[in-house]
Regions:
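Eukaryotic RNA-binding helical-repeat scaffolds
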Residues: 1-140
């Protein structure tokens, strides 16, 4: 009655074609969808530099201060896996600013113990994957 149907994985050409359609949807994506797209593209080594630089990274820059701690940690880890070290302005002006600025309350950001631990683990992961990035400022 219940013979399972084998799942056939497609080749990477199919995924590249799907990823080629993403630029027209990135601006309408929610923050968690952008980060999930980044994670999948990095894990499968899909997507062009144009998609990353002009669409995904642009969306992250606009919204990073609104991310939850979990979403921010996932972003840091995905960018570490990608080996994204070329843009120091992004790290200093946008990504590391998250630790200090909270636009929702208009003052310094505060974290619970678990959130601080999650951020610490993500920064250590970033430093291990990308030793060129100076993470002293957000950790102090």
């Amino acid at each position: 009655m219940g013979d399972s149907i084998g799942v056939i994985k497609t080749d990477d050409v199919f995924f590249e074609r799907i990823v080629g359609l993403l630029p027209m949807f990135v601006m309408k994506m929610e923050n968690y969808q952008v980060i999930r797209t980044l994670e999948v593209c990095v894990k499968r080594n899909l997507g062009s530099e144009r998609l990353f630089d002009h669409y995904i990274l642009h969306s992250i820059e606009k919204n990073v201060l609104r991310y939850s701690v979990d979403l921010y940690s996932r972003m840091v880890r995905a960018l570490a896996d990608k080996g994204f070290v070329e843009d120091y302005v992004f790290w200093d002006k946008f990504a590391f600013r998250y630790v200090y600025d909270d636009p929702k309350v208009g003052r310094d950001r505060t974290f619970t113990h678990d959130e601080a631990k999650m951020l610490w683990d993500s920064f250590v992961y970033l430093k291990l994957k990308c030793p060129q990035i100076d993470i002293k400022e957000p950790l102090i």
